[in-house]
Amino acid sequence: MSECTYYLTVVSVEREIFSGVVRKIQVTGIEGEMGVFPGHTPLLTSIKPGVLRIVKSHDNEEYIYISGGILEVQRNIVTILADTAIRAEELDEKKAKEAKHEAEKHIKNYRHSSDIDYIKITSDISKAIAKLRLMELTKKNKYM
């Protein structure tokens, strides 16, 4: 492993989804988008639902949907413990669009029944948008 890389492991409750040497990653933290480069300061933080962008050697990129979880950065090792982690090819675009549409419909009909309901609906929208973004990025990356 060179000075310009580090080892990344992405695991979910179901399985290990990625393990290997990378140049950098980009993920959505609780404070917003963050990049992790070699030599990053040690860190432990929560991550929000979104797309994990992995840049491997020779600038090859891979994208994974993360539904939230924990990011741990150590000296030469980064670990993501995800609630759910899904590769783009495992997603169903039609189902993701339907989920987004249903959540948007619920939010339009929201009548202050409960703050928890509102939080769940907005979370569902965020997850559906992230899945659709992942599929879009993967398609775009194939044609480059």
Swiss-Prot record:
InterPro entries: ATP_F1_dsu/esu_C_sf, ATP_synth_F1_dsu/esu, ATP_synth_F1_dsu/esu_N, ATP_synth_F1_esu_C, ATPsynth_dsu/esu_N
GO cellular component: plasma membrane; proton-transporting ATP synthase complex
Keywords annotated in UniProt: ATP synthesis, Cell inner membrane, Cell membrane, CF(1), Hydrogen ion transport, Ion transport, Membrane, Transport
Topology within the bilayer: Peripheral membrane protein
Subcellular location: Cell inner membrane
GO molecular function terms attached to this record: ATP binding; proton-transporting ATP synthase activity, rotational mechanism
Cysteine-cysteine disulfides: none
Described purpose of this protein according to its UniProt entry: Produces ATP from ADP in the presence of a proton gradient across the membrane.
Similarity annotation: Belongs to the ATPase epsilon chain family.
Quaternary structure, from the entry: F-type ATPases have 2 components, CF(1) - the catalytic core - and CF(0) - the membrane proton channel. CF(1) has five subunits: alpha(3), beta(3), gamma(1), delta(1), epsilon(1). CF(0) has three main subunits: a, b and c.
PANTHER family: ATP SYNTHASE DELTA/EPSILON CHAIN, ATP SYNTHASE EPSILON CHAIN, CHLOROPLASTIC
Protein name: ATP synthase epsilon chain
